[in-house]
Amino acid sequence: MILIADSGSTKTEWREVSDGVAGKSYISTGINPFFVTGEGMIRLFGKELPELKGAGVSRIFFYGTGVSNASKADIVRAALSSFFGTDKLFIGSDLLGAARSL
């Protein structure tokens, strides 16, 4: 399963995709690496997305606010990798996500 996330500072929308078909969607608190630490992100995932831990997530595309440089992207990358157990990650800005959605 692939997860695609569109994150702002107040909420994150997550969507499962399997075999090219969009599946279930989830809403969690927003993730902005300027305001949330990596440990805070992992706690948030555990509290708000427990059903996705161990659910066979093979790849994640994360587009978010605050992902403005490599060090901020690395914070998000490490948290996602730790919680979901995959290293197949794309981390980009919310602006890139908006452009790709067109």
Predicted regions, residues:
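Short beta-strand-loop/turn "lid" adjacent to the catalytic site in phosphate-handling enzymes
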Residues: 50-90, 102
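A generic local secondary-structure boundary/capping motif
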Residues: 4, 101-102
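General beta-strand structural signal in soluble alpha/beta enzymes
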Residues: 5, 88-94
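Short glycine-rich, Thr/Ser-proximal phosphate-binding strand/loop in the N-terminal lobe
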Residues: 2-43, 56
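Short amphipathic alpha-helix with an adjacent loop that forms part of the alpha/beta core around
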Residues: 42-52
